[in-house]
Each structure stands twice: as C-alpha cells, then as structure tokens.
Amino acid sequence: MVAEKPKTLTSLEGDDKLNSNFVRDEDERPKVAYNEFSNDIPVISLAGIDGEKRGEICRKIVEACEDWGIFQVVDHGVGDDLIADMTRLAREFFALPAEEKLRFDMSGGKKGGFIVSSHLQGEVVQDWREIVTYFSYPTNSRDYTRWPDKPEGWIKVTEEYSNKLMTLACTLLGVLSEAMGLELEALTKACVDMDQKIVVNYYPKCPQPDLTLGLKRHTDPGTITLLLQDQVGGLQATRDGGKTWITVQPVPGAFVVNLGDHGHFLSNGRFKNADHQAVVNSECSRLSIATFQNPSPDATVYPLAIREGENSIMEEPITFADLYRRKMAKDLEIARHKRLAKEEMPFKELDEAKFESKSIDQILA
C-alpha cells in the first residue's frame, strides 16, 4: 500500500523512518556524503570584469563551462546585506505553521507558491524538500497573490534580489557571448523577453538520508541558473554520466552558476549543461535559492555559433516551449516505466495513467 503523500515535511518531523514516498531506487541513491567537499568547481572573482581583468575572467569562465558547466562567482555586486536578508526571511517562512505555508499551495497548476517536492505530476518518488516559487520576470507578469506575505518584508526583499540577479545574469551571458565570438548581448537577445523564476529550496533534516535525494539528478532547461546556498553542503555534480559525483564546496556569499540546456544548445554543445542533484542529511536543515534565467516560451532554440568543421547538434530550430515539453515528456515516461516496474502495473493502466496537457506557464511553474 502506497503511503499518503505529505502536504508539508514539517508533518514528518520526529519520524525515525523515511516515508516510503521518498525512498529512491538503489541506483539513484547518494554515492558521496553531503559534506565530503571537493574543490574541483572553480571559484571566480568578477572584480574588474569591466576593466583590464575582463579577458582573464572570461577565460576562466569559458574553461569552467567547457569542463563542468558549473562555476562559482564572488565579487559579483550583490550586497551581503541583501543576501543575508533573503536567506533569513526564507528560513522564517519555512518555520511557519503548516497552515500558513499551505495558504500559498501551488498544487493543481497554480503559478507560483508553496509545495512539497515538485510541481511535476507523475513522479514516482518525491524529493525531500519544500519549495517556494516566484515568477519574477517579466515584471508585468508578477502575480503578487502567489507571493507569500509572511514573513513581513519578504516581498520587497525578493523584488530587490530579483533585480540584482537579473543584472548579474546579463553580465555573465555577455561573457559567454563574447567567448562565442558574438556581440555582447547575443545570448540575452536569444532569450527574447527573458523569464526569471526564483525557487527557494528548504531541505529539512532527514531520518534516512542515504535512501533519498533532496532533488533528483537533472539538468536545468533554461539558459543559466544562479544558486545561493548556505554553508551546510548538498549540491552535487557529475561530468561522467553519473559514475562519479562531487559535492560542491560552499563559499560564503558566492553564487553557483549552472549552465542549462538552452545555453548548451546555443553554444552548439561547446558549453556543458550542468548535470547535478541535491542530497540531504540527518544533522541539520539546508537552504538554497535558485534563480533560473530562461528564454521566453516562443524564443527559438538553435546554435548561435557553429565552429569550422562542426555540424549543428540540433536537427532543426524549435521553440523553448517545445524543448521543455519534450524534456518533461521524456522525464515522465521514465517515471512511468519505473512505476510499472515497482508496482507491476498492467500496461492498460499505464496507458491510461493521468497526463494532463498544460500551458507553458504551468509547465515552467
């Protein structure tokens, strides 16, 4: 019998055994501890990026994108006080009673708000996390009724944080554009009217962290992601298809930059799309704030620069909406096969499994 899916992870506090909804297959379980840190991911200072150090900084970023698709940046222009406020208010939200958090429940296709694990329907196993999602750009599409009004002041701080992260993202996209031999704003223009989504992840203490994940292995669909994480540790990356993993060393005040699928395709595969996951632990909770910089749904996805002797890695141009739908459909197909294997579902039942048609706004929720 399948256990009922919890509406908050707070309701599971004190359990000494992991709820069966969160138990991963053995091949998906963590292979490296949350605090077994690696220094393989470079930490790059952006100080002087608009001056004489620009060439050196660009070289380091390009090397990281070609090697891992992940790097960390410091001296990025986002103030320490703003980072501290955003982090503090986020933790205060997740400490609220369940009924307060569930006022912003985003299940059922709502655009933004609070949910446990993931917005995707059809997932076999849940991720051990609670999240709050903000759709922050374009600014005229912000729905403040879906932005939590507690703790007091979080909306204002999130607005400022969103604006600063948009500026930082455009700076980094300019570097990558130059590296591809294009004009400074080439990647930003390829996004058309750039979307931004902020996802605040809270990973509570877990009774059996060796059996689950905070966030399953994936690549991000968009252009780049800027991740602010606390000092606990849990972000992991692989560059050999999951054979070996490293845990990214947290750096105070740094942003981890992940290249996404869109950035990978625009570079014709030159820049890797970061293959990563999040693990949890039984000692303490962890907080991270991911800011996803995505192209608009109707933006064309196709390599912007194809080097001599290379062919395009894409057969034809498609829209970002179509790219994302294909990615989601593939993920859900894998999930269905896993469910079939675990529950021995009849093929007829598998064919009739619920798969709702969603708008791109709901898909990117």
UniProtKB/Swiss-Prot annotation:
Keyword Nuclease in annotation: no
Biological processes annotated in GO: flavonoid biosynthetic process
Residues binding 2-oxoglutarate, per UniProt: R286
Pathways involved: Secondary metabolite biosynthesis; flavonoid biosynthesis
EC number: 1.14.11.9
Keywords recorded for this protein, A-Z: Dioxygenase, Flavonoid biosynthesis, Iron, Metal-binding, Oxidoreductase, Vitamin C
Catalytic activity: a (2S)-flavan-4-one + 2-oxoglutarate + O2 = a (2R,3R)-dihydroflavonol + succinate + CO2
Binding residues for Fe cation: H218, D220, H276
InterPro entries: DIOX_N (IPR026992), IPNS-like_FE2OG_OXY (IPR044861), IPNS-like_sf (IPR027443), Oxoglu/Fe-dep_dioxygenase_dom (IPR005123), Plant_2OG-oxidoreductases (IPR050295)
Disulfide links within the chain: none
Cofactor remark: Binds 1 Fe(2+) ion per subunit.
Biological role: Catalyzes the 3-beta-hydroxylation of 2S-flavanones to 2R,3R-dihydroflavonols which are intermediates in the biosynthesis of flavonols, anthocyanidins, catechins and proanthocyanidins in plants.
Entry similarity comment: Belongs to the iron/ascorbate-dependent oxidoreductase family.
PANTHER family: OXOGLUTARATE/IRON-DEPENDENT DIOXYGENASE (PTHR47991)
Protein name in UniProt: Naringenin,2-oxoglutarate 3-dioxygenase
Source organism per UniProt: Dianthus caryophyllus (Carnation)
